[in-house]
Swiss-Prot record:
Protein name listed in UniProt: Cohesin subunit SA-3
UniProtKB keywords: Cell cycle, Centromere, Chromosome, Chromosome partition, Disease variant, Meiosis, Nucleus, Phosphoprotein, Premature ovarian failure
Modified residues (Phosphoserine): S1203
Signal peptide bounds: none
Organism taxonomic ancestry: Eukaryota, Metazoa, Chordata, Craniata, Vertebrata
Biased composition (Basic and acidic residues): 1078-1089
Basic residues bias (residue ranges): 59-69, 76-90
Keyword Phosphoprotein belongs to the record: yes
Name of the gene: STAG3
Tissue: Testis specific.
Gene Ontology BP term (one): establishment of meiotic sister chromatid cohesion
Locations listed in the record: Nucleus; Chromosome; Chromosome, Centromere
Record-level Gene Ontology MF annotations: chromatin binding
Source organism (scientific name): Homo sapiens (Human)
Recorded GO CC terms: chromatin; chromosome, centromeric region; extracellular space; meiotic cohesin complex; nucleolus; nucleoplasm; nucleus; synaptonemal complex
Length: 1225
């Protein structure tokens, strides 16, 4: 008789075998049902709510529910005599092929000739010519349908658009403006040029003599209000370019009117005898004609502005919004008399808050064109007072190109509108000079220059050329630069400030004569901090001029320098070297006592053209420098100073230089001095059991100096290995050697071994040499192993780092590349050493992570440094694992801390896991299981089997198992055998220990099945059946079974039930049409769909959800929180990265649970029902969007956290009279 456990497993198996997945896919529809604009003013910004419309949301929300179903838009005011007739049969004659479209697409012929050719054909047959133009615009939208002469004569615009909408190709989301491929690359430019040329060629005749411009505008207006994105995008572009061309025509008419008025006044003011009445009459007739033309053009512009712009500037598609803003900026610049008013400026101001980068960028660029003209700034005062705060805040925009343009806009405001930017506004820009993005930092540097430096150090121009700056002006510049750097307390590195100012003030920063004169001046009034800053500015400027690239952390994005830049760089390098070679010894002599100042001065040598020491006959200055270098090395023991000194001497000790012998002699003299001191001090240490503090300090300082030079120079001939080993052996045996001495001694022995290996690798070494080196290396490893148990933490960590590096160097990798003769040097650590390394890792790396503060306090800096040191230790251990030095099973000690220490070491552990899987997929999977087993066993030993799955530690283990499952990625078929193997071995472990005979307790390891359930979403349907059978077979060996199923078994069986594999039962989470609208017009990517399925597969255990239904999804809501947690923590959802970022916020509102539509897969009208649903999305979702999007869409616009109050909260602004003008919308 089967037990209850076996019955539970059997029930699950039957449910699994009987399950079947069903899915429905929607036909693609490229229509945007919520494209936001209606001619009657009842529209609402569906996807781009901005703060200026908050006061209108409530009213629109009420109207939205009562709005009738959307129909194809019609012209608001049909022109008298327009073509409005009844519908007729769809059988119509086909017009000839549209050669106009093909010619514009090819973009090979002259556009003016093309337009003239079309105008000739239009004059011969106006109806056919205009029909060809209409079909050109239709074909430019990507529509395969055409307008026939019968349609043209008998149907209205709205009926034509409705007919074309029904014929629109829905198989692809591409249309000419966005289509990929070289043939469409230049189409948009040719299209815009055609519209411009058309108006330009018609402006003197056809534009006023019967050309049906009103019909064309009416057609474009109707198309711009279409639900089809291609119609809306293309027609909006055409309408806005048409408007721009008409604005230029209106401007010319305005000029002609002014000229006519002047001519009329001049003629009328003539005397009676000189006045010509015919001339006055002709001028009056010309004025009347110009006024009529002006009224016609203004009527056209008004129709385009009110019919297209006021609806499309807030369209759901960002490309359309960007077109509108770009063009209105052109109108304001070219025809400022009519368009540069607050009633038009408000649209740019409101759109500054747009969610998309491209739209904000167009806004800022449009404003740059306005503020760049000083004559126009007087009309911008009201706008500036209203939107200045927003423009200043855009300096911190999350998109760098927008932030760069925002800073440049503020520069124009600073130049052309005095007193507008307050000190607080400017102080919000100053920190940006230290930004990591060089373009942004350079723009902020230019702002800083014009605000602080230019007024005091104005460059006087004469004859268009700059005069040489006076010493007083340069001194003022450097004093202001020092004041800003020191008093602002924004940053500690002058290199970033110099780089930011380089493009605008490079000539001043390259005044090395002025810098050195300030530093060497005896009666200077510079403080210690100012001297250090000035030296850092000098070195940063020299490095920038000689190397030509920004400091670490800033990337220009440029691949290389131009020939002109390389020549300038070479000239600057020579100029710098010739000036500083005589002065560098003087600077070192003056500041040799200060380590902070002497270190950057020693680094100056890397900026020199050292050949000038020879060609310029400056050897005497070389001798002075070498003397000062020796004094600095003997005087200091700080690592930074010693490293800089050793590197400077290394640059001079190049055998290619003619002065090599002098530099080599100075090096030998210095090392001899240090070695003699070391031998004397070491002898005293070995003979005496006690040393005072001065003796310890002197010995440690000498060892540090030797260690710094041994790192850069080959000091093998001084034979420092043996005395250092004696010192370390005494430290290990007696423990009487101070730790200050042990640390540099360990480093010295390490460098000695590496330099010996370098010599042996370059030539065929004898067996004796190889054996000697191996003995030294093994002896040093034993010393380091002994130091791992030292009481001093610094010694332990130093020994671990050196030991890790040596084991890696002498690993089997050293014989790769034809160096098989080094095989005797290959070393494998013993098991005891491997165990000690792992134990060290547990004691020093995986300790309780501390919360880092703001980073400003000294304690926070120390904590960050300690974290970096721990990361270095972990990285060394992981490299030993991946290169086969340590047993791969030791990786379980690392992987089991993956989740707990994710914030500190997550990137390192993830990379180790990825590399380990590449080496051996099967073994890596077993290591993951081993990590879980070890954690489970530790928890079991600590707390016992009772209530184990309710402990917080067990919940953390489940999170770790979930993260392990996610690390398998989307290759479900490739990892199939691994996941099945992991489940089987996990089941074996859970039942490996059984309770005593007669006991009713569950096996102690049974709760491990709950951890295995996290891997169940990675299984295929067939594998779940096999695993259920395997579990049932294993349970038969359980002697005593309770009267009810054990909880872990029930949970595990439930994870193998059919409701878990949502990726198989519901291939799409979002309907096709919805996903298309969210993601944009691009074609659906099969990889994106696959990644979406995989994400659904592994993140939840939700029952299969039929498309467009609302089921029990909401009851499982907590599991969706897991996805957000994984994304915030940076989980391994690598396969989900291919999905578009845009629309992620809105996708929460577009899920199937929000549609209460009955789902009947077998119903005959499903396709039509879904089509109607996709066409009426706006009506169904408007309530949700009104309530939720207005607060969500603006959250990520800027990097800084800022919120914008609604109109009702902040009161009416200065533009309220226009903002609340509903008729304009």
């Amino acid at each position: 008789m089967s037990s209850p456990l076996q019955r539970a497993v059997g029930d699950t198996k039957r449910a699994l075998s009987a399950s079947s997945s069903s899915s429905a896919s929607l036909p693609f529809d490229d229509r945007d049902s919520n494209h936001t604009s209606e001619g009657n003013g009842d529209s609402l910004l569906a996807d781009e709510d901005t703060d200026f419309e908050d006061s209108l949301n409530r009213n629109v929300k009420k109207r939205a529910a009562k709005r009738p179903p959307k129909t194809t838009p019609v012209a608001k005011h049909p022109k008298k005599g327009s073509r409005v007739v009844h519908r007729h049969s769809r059988k119509q004659s086909e017009p000839p092929a549209n050669d106009l479209f093909n010619a514009v697409k090819a973009a090979k012929s002259d556009m003016q000739s093309l337009v003239d050719e079309w105008l000739d054909s239009y004059k011969q047959d106006q109806d056919a010519g205009f029909l060809e133009l209409v079909n050109f615009f239709i074909q430019s939208c990507g529509c395969k349908g055409i307008v026939t002469p019968e349609m043209f004569k008998k149907m209205s615009n709205s009926e034509i658009i409705q007919h074309l909408t029904e014929q629109f190709n829905e198989d692809s989301g591409d249309y000419p403006l966005i289509a990929p491929g070289p043939s469409w690359k230049k189409f948009q430019g040719s299209f815009c040029e055609f519209v411009r040329t058309l108006v330009c060629q018609c402006q003197y005749s056809l534009l006023y003599d019967g050309f049906p411009m009103d019909d064309l505008i009416s057609l474009l207006t109707g198309l711009s209000d279409s639900q089809v994105r291609a119609f809306r995008h293309t027609s909006t572009l055409a309408a806005m370019k048409l408007m721009t061309s008409l604005v230029k025509v209106a401007l010319q008419l305005s000029v002609h009117q002014d000229n006519n008025q002047r001519q009329y006044e001049a003629e009328r003011n003539k005397g009676p005898g000189q006045r010509a009445p015919e001339r006055l009459e002709s001028l009056l007739e010309k004025r009347k004609e110009l006024q009529e033309h002006q009224e016609e053009i203004e009527g056209m512009m008004n129709a385009l502005f009110r019919g297209v712009f006021v609806h499309r500037y807030r369209d759901v598609l960002p490309e359309i919004r960007a077109i509108c803003i770009e063009e209105i900026g052109c109108w304001m610049q070219s025809y400022s008399t009519s368009f540069l008013t607050d009633s038009y400026l408000k649209y740019i101001g409101w759109t500054l808050h747009d969610k998309h980068r491209e739209v904000r960028l167009k806004c800022v660029k449009a404003l740059k064109g306005l503020y760049g003209n000083r004559d126009l700034t007087t009309r911008l005062e009201l706008f500036t007072s209203r939107f200045k705060d927003r423009m200043v805040s855009m300096v911190m925009d999350r998109e760098y190109d927008v932030a760069v343009e925002a800073v440049r806009l503020l520069i124009l405001i600073l130049k052309n509108m005095e007193g507008v930017l307050t000190d607080a506004d400017c102080e919000s820009v100053y920190p940006v000079v230290y930004a990591s993005h060089r373009g942004l930092a350079s723009a902020a540097g230019e702002f800083l220059y014009w605000k602080l430096f230019y007024p005091e150090c104005e460059i006087r121009m004469m004859g268009g050329r700059e005069q040489r700056q006076s010493p007083g002006a340069q001194r003022t510049f450097f004093q202001l630069l020092l004041s800003f750097f020191v008093e602002s307390e924004l940053h500690d590195h002058a290199a970033y400030l110099v780089d930011s100012l380089w493009d605008c003030a490079g000539a001043r920063l390259k005044d090395w004569e002025g810098l050195t004169s300030l530093l060497l001046e005896k009666d200077q009034n510079l403080g210690d901090v100012q001297e250090s800053t000035l030296i850092e500015i000098l070195v940063s400027s020299a490095r920038q001029a000689s190397e030509g690239h920004p400091p670490v952390g800033r990337v220009t994005g440029r691949k290389g320098l131009t020939s002109k830049e390389r020549k300038t760089q070479a000239d600057d390098r020579v100029k710098l070297t010739e000036h500083l070679i005589p002065l560098l010894p003087q600077l070192l002599a003056k500041f040799s006592a200060d380590a902070e100042k002497v270190t950057p001065l020693l680094q100056l040598l890397s900026c020199f053209d050292l050949h000038i020491y020879c060609t310029g006959r400056l050897e005497k200055h070389l001798e002075l420098f070498l003397q000062q270098l020796q004094e600095v090395v003997v005087k200091h023991a700080e690592p930074a100073v010693l490293e800089a000194g050793a590197h400077a001497l290394y640059l001079l000790c190049n055998p290619e230089f003619t002065f090599f012998s002098r530099a080599d002699f100075a090096r030998s003299q210095l090392v001899d001095l240090l070695t003699d001191r070391f031998q004397q001090e070491l002898e005293e240490l070995l003979q005496s059991s006690f040393l005072d503090e001065d003796e310890v300090y002197n010995l440690a300082a000498t060892l540090k100096r030797l260690s710094a030079f041994y790192n850069t120079h080959d000091l093998t001939r001084w034979e420092l290995y043996e005395p250092c080993c004696q010192l370390l052996q005494k430290a290990v045996d007696t423990g009487e050697v101070p730790h200050q001495v042990i640390l540099p001694a360990l480093t010295l022995v390490y460098f000695s071994i590496l330099w010996t290996l370098t010599h042996i690798s370059k030539s065929d070494a004898s067996q004796k040499q190889l054996s000697s080196l191996r003995d030294r290396m093994v002896a040093f490893c034993e010393l380091c192993q002994s130091c791992l148990s030292d009481v001093d933490t610094e010694i332990q960590e130093q020994a671990f780092v050196l030991l890790s590096d040596l084991l890696l160097i002498f690993s089997p990798q050293m014989i790769v590349g034809g160096r098989d003769f080094l095989r005797p040097l290959v070393f494998f650590p013993e098991a005891t050493l491997q165990s000690e390394l792992a134990s060290f890792l547990m004691d020093h790396v995986f300790i309780q992570p501390g919360d880092l503060g703001s980073g400003d306090s000294q304690e926070d800096h120390l904590q960050i440094e300690r974290l970096h040191q721990r990361r270095r230790l972990l990285a060394g251990f992981c490299k030993l694992l991946l290169y086969g030095v340590l047993e791969m099973d030791a990786a379980s000690d690392v992987f089991k801390h993956y989740n707990k220490f994710y914030n500190d070491y997550g990137d390192i552990i993830k990379e180790t896991l990825t590399r380990a899987r590449q080496i051996d997929r099967s073994h890596c999977s077993r290591i993951l299981l081993l990590s879980l087993k070890q954690l489970y066993t530790e928890l079991l030993q600590e707390h016992g089997p009772q209530g184990l799955n309710e402990l917080p530690a067990f919940i953390e283990m489940r999170d770790l198992a979930r993260r392990f499952a996610l690390s398998f990625g989307p290759q479900q078929l490739q990892n199939r055998d691994l996941v099945v193997m992991l489940h089987k071995e996990g089941i074996q472990f859970s039942l490996s220990e059984l309770p005593p005979a007669g006991s009713s307790n569950q096996p102690p390891n049974l709760a491990f099945l709950e951890l295995l359930s996290e891997f169940s979403p990675r299984l295929f349907h067939q594998d779940k059946q096999l695993l259920l059978s395997y579990l049932e077979k294993c349970l038969q060996h359980v002697s005593q079974a309770p009267g009810h199923p054990w909880g872990p078994v029930t949970t595990y069986c439930h994870s193998l039930s059919p409701v878990e594999n949502t990726a198989e039962t519901s291939p799409q989470v979002l309907p096709s049409s919805k996903r298309r609208r969210v993601e944009g017009p691009a074609k659906p990517n099969r990889e994106d769909v696959s990644s979406s399925q995989e994400e659904s597969l592994q993140l939840n255990s939700i029952p299969p959800t039929p498309t467009l239904t609302s089921t029990a999804v909401k009851s499982r809501q907590p599991l969706w929180g897991l996805k957000e947690m994984e994304e915030e923590d940076g989980s391994e959802l690598d396969f989900a990265q291919g999905q578009p970022v845009a629309g992620t916020e809105r996708s929460r509102f577009l899920g199937p649970q929000y549609f209460q539509t009955p789902h009947n897969p077998s119903g005959p009208g499903l396709g039509n029902q879904l089509m109607r649903l996709s066409l009426m999305e706006e009506d169904e979702e408007e309530e949700l969007e009104i309530q939720d999007e207005s607060n969500e869409e603006r959250q990520d616009t800027d990097m800084q956290a800022s919120s914008y109050s609604s109109t009702s909260e902040r009161g009416l602004d200065l533009l309220d009279s226009t903002e609340l003008d509903i008729e304009d919308f």
